[in-house]
């Protein structure tokens, strides 16, 4: 009997001890949870969303600025509002050609533009936007950039010039027209002394072909044509050209050219600001740039094809650039590339990398893909 009582007393004591431990354990856990619940909302409220101020190199009216805003919307949505990027138009903070410096210094947190606008800082930068591309289109350039070593070479270029930025190439452009003129250009000699606007390495191309080149940002081209400061100019595509007012000052547009047949956009972040972001946000930004790239190409196909028709309704006459001029462009490119490679080792390294990638990508593309002109003529141009 005593043994039973003793055991019962021991059991009760043990049970009491465990009960007290469980109570205090739960109480401690509850206190920690309460502390956590109070602490984390306070941190979240103190931090709030991260706000970045960006600027594009495009006027508000241009579809290019719309593409820039599309990218920021994707980032803002994908981060659930934790990162909010505001995209201002060209000139809101700095001129279009001043974007790289402004982002490097932190005056702006980032921007949307093209590498050709930085040609004056390092001519090899233009190989990513307005160079010969060795027959590649813009999608091939993006493929080379991501998988063929281009990304690493661009980072090397920025390090060489002290560019404090993180760069993402995004948005393949169509082949750009030869230009808008007062009358059709039928031979290379027609360019002699012509006051012409272009940018990037295409400056060298048109200069060697006889034109007097003036590099202007997109929003300044049509006013210069209207005032007679230019005799001809190129910008980019049916939508941009129409929105910027090209058909108001010219009714002649020459299609097809090798001066800018593979340009892409560039999205840049101030490196310090970008490196300060959580890794999750950095991953979102990279994926958003690629999502925006794909979406831009689809939107461009829809809008450009419509505005190509609208331009014709506006009275614009389109002419194919003569093959003799196209062949001359290729010959001139050979001379320019050889000359730049002699004096700029980085230019030579990037050019060689592009050329090697193009030699296999072009062969695959031409051998595997159809001549779509045959199908178009069959379905839509029956006599």
Residue ranges and their predicted role:
Residues 2, 10-141, 159-383:
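N-terminal secretory/targeting leader peptides
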Residues 139-155:
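A gly/proline- and charged-residue-enriched helix-loop-helix capping module
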């Amino acid at each position: 009997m005593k043994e039973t009582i003793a055991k019962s007393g021991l059991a009760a004591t043990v049970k009491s001890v465990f009960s007290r431990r469980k109570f205090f354990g739960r109480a401690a856990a509850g206190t920690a949870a309460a502390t956590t619940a109070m602490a984390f909302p306070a941190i979240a409220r103190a931090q709030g969303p991260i706000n970045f101020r960006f600027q594009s190199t495009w006027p508000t009216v241009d579809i290019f600025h719309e593409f820039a805003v599309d990218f920021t919307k994707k980032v803002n949505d994908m981060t659930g509002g934790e990162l909010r990027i505001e995209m201002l138009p060209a000139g809101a903070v700095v001129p279009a050609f001043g974007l790289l410096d402004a982002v490097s210094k932190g005056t702006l947190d980032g921007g949307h533009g093209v590498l050709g606008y930085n040609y004056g800082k390092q001519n090899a930068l233009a190989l990513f936007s307005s160079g010969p591309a060795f027959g590649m289109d813009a999608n091939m350039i993006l493929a080379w950039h991501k998988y063929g070593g281009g990304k690493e070479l661009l980072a090397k270029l920025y390090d060489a010039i002290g560019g404090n930025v993180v760069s993402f190439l995004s948005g393949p452009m169509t082949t750009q027209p030869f230009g808008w003129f007062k009358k059709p250009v039928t031979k290379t000699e027609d360019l002699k002394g012509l006051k012409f606007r272009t940018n990037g390495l295409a400056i060298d191309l048109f200069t060697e072909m006889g034109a007097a080149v003036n590099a202007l940002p997109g929003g300044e081209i049509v006013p210069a044509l209207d005032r007679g400061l230019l005799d001809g100019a190129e910008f980019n595509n049916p939508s941009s050209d129409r929105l910027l007012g090209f058909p108001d000052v010219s009714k002649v547009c020459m299609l097809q050219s090798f001066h800018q047949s593979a340009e892409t956009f560039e999205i840049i972040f101030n490196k310090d600001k970008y490196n300060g972001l959580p890794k999750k946000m950095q991953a979102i930004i990279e994926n958003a740039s690629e999502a925006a790239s794909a979406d831009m190409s689809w939107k461009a196909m829809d809008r450009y094809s419509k505005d190509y028709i609208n331009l014709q309704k506006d009275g614009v006459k389109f002419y194919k650039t003569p093959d003799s001029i196209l062949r001359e462009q290729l010959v001139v490119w050979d001379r320019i590339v050889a000359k730049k490679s002699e004096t700029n080792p980085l230019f030579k390294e990037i050019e060689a990398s592009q050329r090697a990638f193009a030699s296999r990508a072009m062969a695959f593309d031409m051998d595997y893909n159809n001549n779509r002109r045959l199908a178009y003529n069959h379905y839509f141009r029956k006599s």
